[in-house]
A protein has these predicted regions:
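Conserved class I S-adenosyl-L-methionine
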Residues: 153-186
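A short glycine-rich, Lys/Arg-flanked "PGG" loop and its adjoining helix->strand segment in the class I
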Residues: 71, 138-153
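A short acidic, Gly/Pro-enriched loop at the edge of an enzyme's catalytic core
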Residues: 115-125
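Short glycine-dipeptide loop
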Residues: 52, 76-77, 148-154
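Class I SAM-dependent transferase core
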Residues: 20-57, 62-66, 95
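Hydrophobic beta-strand segment of the Class I
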Residues: 56, 125-126
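Class I SAM-dependent methyltransferase SAM/SAH-binding core
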Residues: 57-115
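Core SAM-dependent methyltransferase catalytic element
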Residues: 198-220
Length: 220
């Protein structure tokens, strides 16, 4: 086989990898996540006072559905940092981004105690169903503060613990179960130097079935 043929074969393989990874999850589940993200992102953008062209981080991006929809909302001049932990999660996010041929999403591996985001890179950051898993929240909150521009906002979307549920391994015991009270989120973020802006008891507000709350903070 000639070098040109080998290079062409490798290129075809690299193109096929994202599609193969995307196909590992049920198409219905992926579609449902995209539809939910399409409903939620405009409301999140309004809550965070976002504008097209801004730079936003989706910390703990999961399958990448919200990152993809947010990147489209922000437009080609905007940017989304999509972060998560672990090769499988990062590959799934890259597959979602490649499927929509987006050039304004930066996929970044996060850490247990740090976002690994550049200093003062973001106008806003959000974490959905993520914060209650953190084992070193104080260090992580300091990392979030460092990643925001002055006046930037962070939104935490999470759920209160069920009484009697088990606390994930390594997570602080004051959570009271699997989940986290909104009051603890407020305490920890204000301790880290954030200003508390608002707490919404349900997120999204119009979804009566949702157990999520939203707490928003601003970097002074």
């Amino acid at each position: 086989m000639t070098l040109r043929c080998r290079c062409a074969s490798v290129a075809c393989l690299l193109i096929a990898i994202p599609a193969a990874l995307a196909s590992q999850r049920p198409a219905g589940a992926v579609r449902q996540e995209r539809e939910q993200a399409a409903r939620e992102v405009p409301k999140l953008a309004e809550t965070l006072a976002l504008e097209p062209g801004m730079i936003v981080a989706d910390v703990g991006a999961g399958g990448g559905a919200v990152s993809v929809v947010m990147a489209k909302w922000l437009g080609p001049e905007g940017r989304v940092y999509a972060t998560d932990i672990g090769a499988a999660q990062l590959a799934e996010i890259r597959a979602a981004v490649a499927q929509d041929a987006l050039s304004n999403v930066v996929v970044l591996e996060g850490g247990e105690s740090s976002t690994n985001l550049p200093n003062e890179c973001c106008d806003a950051i959000f974490l959905r169903d993520v914060y209650h898993h953190l084992t070193r929240p104080g260090e992580f909150d300091a990392s979030l503060l460092a990643a925001l521009k002055p006046g930037g906002r962070v939104a935490i979307m999470d759920f209160p613990p069920d009484p009697g549920s088990s606390i994930p391994a390594g997570v602080p015991a004051d959570r009271g179960g699997h989940g986290i009270p909104a009051s603890i989120v407020v305490t920890e973020f204000t301790r880290a130097g954030f200003r508390h802006v608002t707490t919404m008891s349900r997120w999204p507000p119009e979804d009566d079935r949702s157990r999520l709350f939203l707490v928003m903070f601003e970097k002074p």
